Amino acid sequence: MQSFSDMAEDGGERFSSLRFAGLNSQNSPQAECEPLKNLGFRLQYLEEQGQPDISVIDSQVHLWSMRPELIQLLIDAHASFNLLPRTLFLAVNILDRYCSKQTVYEQYYKLAGLSALLISSKLVDPPDHTPHMQDLLKFCQCDYDRSILIKMERHILKILDWSMRNATVYDFVQLMTCDGGS
């Protein structure tokens, strides 16, 4: 099996965007592979740009103890709303990048996670699959209201300078599972 680097150098132009064709209980994930020059460079650049600064998150000790519960909530919401796999990976990345650029107080950590999931869903999922804010808030049984969720969503976008594109683990897995370009 070729490594990612070998594929990018030898035939990276075979791949351009990795779109998820669909996933449900009857279908397996399918990747569509399209031409692109310098795929390795592009994915590496996106990955580097999308890495959170863990040392900043480490300084917010309370986040690590709350993280397992929040990640489980995001996984449950992701499954409940039948969102695409990439949505969850991107949501966690958005949350981590936000927490590495902004001090997040305990009472707002869950709100930041839900907002990250909502942002991610708007970017990745078809418009008719994006959860409505009220449904998301009802699902998590939160004390937040729609207006605070909107404010957090805007704040995350502002702090991250509207930079939502990045390469996730899911993108690399999709690349590795692409049919050899035939």
Feature locations, PLM:
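Acidic, Ser/Thr/Pro-rich regulatory low-complexity segments at or just upstream of the first helical elements
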Residues: 1-114, 118-175
